[in-house]
Amino acid sequence: METELLNIEKVSPEEKAAALKKAGEIIREGGLVAFPTETVYGLGADALNAEASAKIYAAKGRPSDNPLIVHIHDVDQVYEIASEVPEAAKKVMEKFWPGPLTVILNKKSCVPDGTTGGLKTVAIRMPSHPLARDFIRESGRMIAAPSANTSGRPSPTLASHVYEDMQGRIPLILDGGAVGIGIESTIIDMSTDTSTILRPGYITKDMLEEVLPKVNIDPAVTGRTMKKNVVAKAPGMKYRHYAPKGQLTLVEGDRDKVIAKINELVKEKEEEGHKVGVIGTDETLDSYHADILRSIGSRQKPETVAANLYRILREFDDLECDYMYSESFFEQGLGNAIMNRMLKAAGYHLITL
């Protein structure tokens, strides 16, 4: 299969319309299209077509019990696929949609088990990226979409990342430039009387509690070991995710001790002949001694850290780093989501000083 890469960001209205029309036709025919959202690039198919959803799992090499998120362009579409929409869910959708929040509700029978990983619930999101909503609208379908990377790898934040993983596996990639947020949406389970965060993201617990009386966090989110014998109620809960090809290790503790430890580890691995990368911050990068150094952003601006994370992990892959070391981040607000992704990317390799 030949994979076409179509730019829809800086083109004429006619060229954009033609690209979206082509993408919509592929979806209606049961095919796959990669498209930009405000979080990461998604790999989309007709959510109500079980055969189309199965193609997503095949293209990614994704376990079939790992549910997909259904992307919509209009809030009224929720009522087509959810058997009930609690008042609390309506408040959350009104406040945070369109945006980087996925809401889990009990599903109607029209949603195939192949889309939900065999669950009786459905994960729904209305993205804020205008190109994503234009694509969904043009397709005339609701779009099931995980991140557009091969399973387990760092999520794509550029169309070139998608092409690297999906070339020859899908017919079309819509190139909308760099995404804004850089990590996947927050997922909140509202299928029961209790509202529970199953995956942290840009929308934080504190933000959700501005409209909900209480929000719980699933223990799997804050855990520091991989839980294997669990039901994956949401994407990212059960399997290794976001991982570079080399071994990433996080180091946490007092700043000066962390820097000293990372420099010690780098020296040890470089003397063994390995290629080593270090992830620092704007505030600490000059303190490290390694051939390959990258600043992930500023601790004062955690949104920059989130936006750069997957890009840097992919850069280290391109540079064929055997080992990577990174500072850890304070687990509060957006830092919860950052550490959740980094721990999974590291396979929970963490040194605490």
Question: Where in the sequence are the language-model features?
Answer:
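Active-site-adjacent structural elements in enzyme catalytic cores
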Residues: M1-L353
